[in-house]
């Protein structure tokens, strides 16, 4: 009787150990898969704001942290694009703090000469049917930044038409596009300062 109990106890212990090990392996595999999918989604998003033929380095391995008021409160990431090891452009995370329903998060692709190469909204809480037209899936409005050059902080073209600029506002929603235009402009201007900062920037993960 005692031998039988011990035998069953050992069997259960081995089963439990095996189950725990299998669960750990599955969890690790799941984490790896989720991480890989996140990287692929990020890469696809990068392609929308920075033409792949402009650089030949791994952007995701060229990530730096910056604390710049021009990009909004807190720390933001910048990804430096290089062509044959020469810095040529950047993808910059930026925050428009003055959206109608709160902060709007964006990424902006820009070269170092004041030209915006593309931008996309990554997070917002704007009103459905009005301010949410900043999303690419709902409107092509966000694509109108591509190829636009900023001549300086006082460039009047970088405003919505209601304020005398070149960018359309939305019917019934001016605050949202105004916030995005201003945030993209600030990010584009900030990009011009990046080459000089590169030796001093903190790499992501450090």
Curated annotation (Swiss-Prot):
Pfam families attached to this UniProt entry: FMN_bind
Localisation: Cell inner membrane
InterPro entries per the UniProt record, alphabetical: FMN-bd, Ion_transpt_RnfG/RsxG
GO biological process: electron transport chain
Cofactor requirements of the protein: FMN
EC supergroup of this enzyme: translocase
Modified residues (FMN phosphoryl threonine): 174
Membrane topology: Single-pass membrane protein
Main location: membrane
Family designation: Belongs to the RnfG family.
Protein name: Ion-translocating oxidoreductase complex subunit G
Organism: Salmonella typhimurium (strain LT2 / SGSC1412 / ATCC 700720)
């Amino acid at each position: 009787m005692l031998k039988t109990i011990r035998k069953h106890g050992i069997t259960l212990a081995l089963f439990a150990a095996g189950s725990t090990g299998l669960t750990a392996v599955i969890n690790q595999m799941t984490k790896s898969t989720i991480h890989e999918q996140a990287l692929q989604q990020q890469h696809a998003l990068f392609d929308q704001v920075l033409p792949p033929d402009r650089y030949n380095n791994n952007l995701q391995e060229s990530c730096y942290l910056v604390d710049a008021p021009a990009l909004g409160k807190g720390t933001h990431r910048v990804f430096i694009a290089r062509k044959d090891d020469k810095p040529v452009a950047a993808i910059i995370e930026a925050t428009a703090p003055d959206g109608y329903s709160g902060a709007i998060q964006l990424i902006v692709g820009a070269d170092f000469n004041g030209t915006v190469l593309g931008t996309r909204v990554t997070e917002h809480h704007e009103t459905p049917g009005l301010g949410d037209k900043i999303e690419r899936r709902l409107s092509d409005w966000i694509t109108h930044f591509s190829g636009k050059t900023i001549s300086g902080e006082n460039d009047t073209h970088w405003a919505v038409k209601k304020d005398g600029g070149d960018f359309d506002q939305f019917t019934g929603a001016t605050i949202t596009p105004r916030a995005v235009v201003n945030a993209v402009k600030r990010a584009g201007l900030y990009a011009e300062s990046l080459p000089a900062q590169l030796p001093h920037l903190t790499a992501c993960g450090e």
